[in-house]
Structure formats: C-alpha cells, structure tokens
Amino acid sequence: IVMNSGNYWITISAMIAPILIGILAGITGEQEQEAGNYQIIRKSTHRGMNFLAKAMYLIGILTFFVVFSMLLLYVSIWCIYKPENYTLIPALKTTLIFIVGSLFLVPFQLWISIYLGMGASIGIGILGTIFVSYISSFPMLEEQLWRVIPWIWTLKTTTLYFENISLSVQGVNLPLDLAIQFVSFVLLLIGVVLWFKNWEGKSKE
C-alpha cells in the first residue's frame, strides 16, 4: 500500500509540477509586464537580486506544494492503514529529492515568461506535463533519455530513491545525478540573472 501510494504521488506530482511552475512563472512575468513593461525591476539598482527574489518566491511556492501534498499523503496512509516501520524521515527525503529535481524548471520557465510571455510559459509547462505522462509509459525510453531532459528528473530520481529508500541504487549513481541536477539549476539561475541584468525589455503589444 505504501509503495503503490508513494509511486502514485510521485507520478502525479511530477506531472503537475511543470504546469504549476509554468503557470506561476507566467503570472509573475505578466504582472511585471502589466506594471510597466518591466520598468520597475529593470530600473532598480539591484535588478539581478530582484529577479533572484522572484525565482526564490516560485521555489517557495513549489516547495510548499510538494511538502504539503507529501504530508497529506503520509497522514492519510498512517491514519487509514497504520503500517509498521512507516516513518516520516523517508517521506521527507523523498520530498527533498523531488524538489531538487524540479529546481531547474523554475529559472527556465521564468525566463520563458519574461522573454516570450505568459502564454509561452504556460504552454511549455503543459507540454512538460504531457511529456512526463508520455515518457513514463515507456520505461526503456525513459531510462535512455531521463538524464538529458529536465522534465523527467523529478520522476526518475524520486522513484529510484523511493523504491529503494536509499541513495545507494545498483547501477545508478544517484548522489551524482542529484548533484548534477542542482549544479545545472545554479548555473542556469546565474546565467538568467546575468541576462536579466542586461536585458532592455520588450515592446508591449
């Protein structure tokens, strides 16, 4: 019961996360656009920090969604089934790994929202959700592609940990994969912050 419920949570959350991030990033970008074509944050002397603050805000919302949904699942399983040796620690570790895998999408979707608009951000988020749903139906294809496609990171790494309740997984260097995902997020975030500091805005239609 615990394993099946956890796998369902991982799959459903991995499909929701891209569209959730896409919508939130789209709304954030649209608010700045409507407030004056990004003039407020672009004219700030700390425009890079302002962009970083928006990214951290989105990460905070994402973290709340993931933690809340996992705690809801944990409490539900505990109250209904009362399984033995079912502690909160593995659930929290699963949540942390899920969040690490999702981080890359935040600066990416925020950049899409600012550069291409709210519609593009939401559209790419929807495509990410569809892609996760599709690729999860083909395990062999998923195994070959997941490391190079950020939308699959949460699904794969979280599933690997949850099914083994360990970072030591035969045939997979899970700590290295998580480190690469986190470093990729940091590098992208730095790159987008530097881009935004020099961005001159876009014409408002």
Question: Which residues does each predicted region cover?
Answer:
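Hydrophobic alpha-helical segments typical of transmembrane helices
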Residues: A25, G36-N37, F108, P150
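Transmembrane helix-loop junction
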Residues: Q31, K43, Y74-W78, I114, ...
